[in-house]
A protein has these predicted regions:
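Active-site neighborhoods of enzymes that stabilize oxyanions during catalysis
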Residues: 36, 80, 148-221, 301-331
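Thiolate-centered catalytic microenvironments shared by cysteine-dependent enzyme domains
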Residues: 90-185, 189, 209, 269-286, ...
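Classical Sec-dependent N-terminal signal peptides that target proteins to the secretory pathway
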Residues: 3-31
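Positively charged, proline/Ser/Thr-rich regional signature most characteristic
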Residues: 32-107, 116, 187-252, 256
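C-terminal soluble interaction/assembly domains
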Residues: 247, 257-309
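Short active-site oxyanion
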Residues: 46-50, 139-140, 259-260, 284
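Short, structured coil segments at secondary-structure junctions
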Residues: 65-67, 137, 219, 282, ...
Length: 331
């Protein structure tokens, strides 16, 4: 009798464990694109979960980081490069595979991207890395709401110091080219249907100010201005609630029924716009014009409008701005 009872208990515990693993993996697969620090607490230092921390410097990471996280820098590690004078373009697929593999990440891992959490540029960099993973066909990926700042400010959360070089893995991608738009796609939207989303500030959209690598002031005809700061709460890395984001796009006249293309000066800020529409609001046909105005504005055959007629776009030149341009935003 005791033997029978023992066998039954063994079978029960075995299947209970299988059910637990099933629902644990289900939770990972269907996790939201934005997760909070409480969700992350129970996920740190797990074999199939990789926390990728984006920092301004290795020194910042060494001072304090989430346990078992992996350090990266958006600029120095090579997440983007310049091609034909167009900055902030994704490198070749093979180079991206090598880069991600060097972090010890495989295509089956769940990746949580953690930015410093200090403002919209942090959010844009994190969203650009997220977009890169999605472009490579990665399935399981999220951003940490509030970034590392929100994690560190919770005294119940542990942090580590120092740096450990991750063990390299082979990363294999399944590229999804449908996420990228080119200038021909943009022209089709101008002349037919769909929406162009200008993610820059209203001053740049209207042509009051402009910044290299955009070579002309103003915006693309028929573009709708939805600045990045609208996506975030008070210049932090905390996203607005979904219902409020829906109101923003509804107010701006953007519908899910037709496709959308996001752009900015060089594809960085618009990565955040893409993330909100594609991942949070689940717009089914949203693309990123990665080359953005860096490509568009230098081709004088392509139209731009100066909404308040602040300048003559056909003659205006960037002058000194070109010399002072840096891929890294000012701190």
């Amino acid at each position: 009798m005791n033997l029978l009872l023992g066998n039954l208990m063994y079978i029960f515990n075995k299947y209970l464990f299988i059910i637990f693993i099933y629902f644990f993996n289900l939770n990972i697969i269907y996790a939201d694109p934005v997760v909070d620090k409480d969700w992350l607490k129970n996920k740190i230092c797990k074999d199939n979960i990789k926390i990728l921390e984006v920092h301004r410097s290795k020194k910042d990471y060494e001072i304090a980081h989430i346990p078992c996280s992996i350090y990266t820098n958006f600029y120095s590690d090579g997440w983007r490069e310049t091609k034909d004078s167009i900055p902030l373009l994704m490198p070749s697929v093979s180079n991206l595979e090598k880069l991600i593999g060097s972090f010890g990440i495989s295509s089956s891992d769940y990746v949580i991207i953690v930015a410093p959490g200090l403002g919209k540029y942090d959010a844009a960099e994190a969203a650009a890395i997220y977009f890169t993973f999605k472009y490579l066909g990665h399935k399981n990926i999220s951003l940490l709401d509030g970034g590392f700042k929100s994690w560190k400010e919770d005294w119940d959360n542990d942090t580590e110091t120092g740096f450990i070089l991750p063990q390299k893995k082979i990363y294999r991608s399944k590229v999804n080219k449908n996420l990228l738009a080119n200038k021909d796609d943009v022209l089709k939207v101008i002349n037919k249907s769909g929406y162009l989303i200008d993610a820059r500030s209203s001053a740049m959209y209207m042509g009051i100010n402009y910044l290299f690598p955009a070579l002309r002031a103003g915006t693309i005809p028929n573009a709708v201005n939805i600045p990045n700061e609208w996506m975030l709460k008070n210049n932090t890395l905390f996203f607005q609630e979904r219902e409020n984001l829906e109101k923003i796009f509804e107010y701006s006249g953007i519908s899910k029924k037709e496709g959308q293309i996001s752009f900015c000066n060089a594809g960085l800020e618009s990565a955040l716009s893409w993330f909100v529409m594609s991942e949070i609001l689940e717009f089914p046909n949203n693309k990123l014009y990665e080359s953005s105005l860096a490509e568009w504005s230098k081709d004088m055959s392509l139209p731009m409008i100066d909404i308040i007629n602040f300048s003559n776009n056909s003659k205006k030149s960037v002058g000194k701005d070109k010399e002072s341009f840096s891929m890294k935003p000012e701190e």
